[in-house]
Amino acid sequence: MKALDKETAIARMNTFGRNGTPFLFVIDYMQEHSYVEPLDGIDTSVCLYQFRGTGNAPDAGARYAGTIDWEFTPPAPADYRRSFNTVRRNLLGGNSYLTNLTCKVPLRTNLTLKDVFLHSHALYKLWLKDRFVCFSPEIFVRMEEGRIKSFPMKGTIDATLPHAESILLDDAKEAAEHATIVDLIRNDLSMVSEHVTVASYRYIDRLQTNKGPILQTSSEICGMLPGDYTKRLGDILFSLLPAGSITGAPKPRTMQIIAEAEGYERGFYTGVMGCYADGRLDSAVMIRFIEQEDGQLYFKAGGGITAQSRWESEYNEVIQKIYVPIY
């Protein structure tokens, strides 16, 4: 698989869509490196994918028979607070209303990247040999029959807590964060479609993990695409990037704040992955992500920060998200 620059990736997606060629796409956070490959040309020794039960790895999701060793080194609280304060200063200064702050966390486990792919349970999974594995629960956009839909996911809580669902839905900070991202995604979809509406607001998803169940809130936003959209799949998708749920609002200024606060390169983490086949485009945000660098594994995780956020709660949410859905 050959990495492509932005312009080449857009043109390739447009061509495949125009010709009705089924293809896989993987796009990094900054849209500087992308893979766009016809499905029948993917080498399974290098790349495996499974998106909502469809892919090139029929054994994906098989039960893991062994014991999982899982240790990680979270950021020092002082380091996280320093990054948090950079974000908060900009929030209070009016430069952003919502900023997604993420971390790069060293991980030690007996699982290989391929093990995680084969045995994890997630809506969207991708493995690139010796690079990374992603097991994402978050849909980015779907395009089908002239409609585009997006499903931003914001708000997380331990499902074992008493009254967890009510606590999550009643949390003022989580509600404000979710409202902001829904408004951002609605505006994004309005750039490429018409008659944009919020079809469902703050519904609850339950996710199983190796550390226990969690609850997350999502919304569904829909719009009507132009008649020639299959000929412009690359143009449409790239115009929506990076995903609003993993940047914030307003997007351009917030990305500058992220670069200042995080101090590392996200790479493919928080990019998007997906495929196009039979007239349908399906994609996911690349969250829940383990990367391999020089033999060391890193779990990348984060969450949305608003002016109402407390650093301790956000720090604990990052730790809560460092899991694998193997059970």
Predicted regions and their residues:
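Extended alpha-helical targeting/anchoring segments
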Residues: 1-327
